[in-house]
Amino acid sequence: MAQRYQNIMVAIDGSKEADLAFVKGVHSALRNDAKLTIAHVIDTRALQSVSTFDAEVYEELQVDAESLMKEYEKRAKDAGVADVHIVIEMGNPKTLLARAIPDAEEVDLILVGAT
């Protein structure tokens, strides 16, 4: 018997590989009638110090992430996915995408690109 998924998470970073994972995620969500969680993590490790991480930098990163995610949300809904959820977090992508977000969102399948 084939595995059925209820909540599929796709990690998006703007790369071509992530876009390919997104397409597979949309197809999997449609095939399983599943919720599609689209996750993006703003990598704060690249910021050198707390002083460089001011409100303006935060706002710009957040606005860019929201714009990217709205685009993916629209694509998923246009493809026919009924339940689409967006998650934007700041921090270490490895820990957030592998553990924190999937646990919080009760994800049972994670799709990521090779970037």
What annotation goes with each model-predicted range?
Residues 69-73:
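A conserved short alpha-helical segment within the catalytic HATPase_c
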Residues 2-52, 79:
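Small/aliphatic-rich secondary-structure junction motif
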Residues 18, 65-68, 93:
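Conserved donor sugar-nucleotide recognition element shared by glycan-biosynthetic enzymes
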Residues 13-14, 60-61, 86:
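A generic structural signal for short
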